[in-house]
């Protein structure tokens, strides 16, 4: 079975913490997690660098692409083996609320505390 790929902002403290949290939940190692700054990562799923600057992305093992809050919910569902996060996200009303909150987080992500950014910890991962 191939892994899903979660693409996140490796220069963001909050994003790095979220990625690390998902990795801890993913005991079966179903998700490969990479910063979009890593050479070739955006292109490997048909995305541009600019698209990855705007949101996190997750490509499932069947090729489905999820963006933003959808990518987070898909990652949680895959990591835990529980469809509930993604099922809730797909419910009308909940999706709109989560997407709105996600947009706020994206706007202020570099002000939200978290871990030392991935690209600061692993500079070789972020060389383009």
Describe the residue ranges of each PLM region.
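A short linear-motif detector with a strong N-terminal bias
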Residues: 11-14, 35-38, 99
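Thiol-based oxidoreductase modules, predominantly thioredoxin-like and allied folds used
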Residues: 28-42
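Short, structurally constrained coil/turn elements
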Residues: 25-27, 52
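Generic structural marker for isolated residues within well-ordered, non-membrane alpha-helices
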Residues: 19, 38, 72
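Glycine-rich, phosphate-binding/catalytic loops in enzymes
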Residues: 24-25, 75
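Local sequence-structure signature of Cys/Sec-based thiol-disulfide redox active-site neighborhoods
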Residues: 1-24
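Thiol/selenol-based redox catalytic cores and closely related redox-interacting motifs
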Residues: 41-128
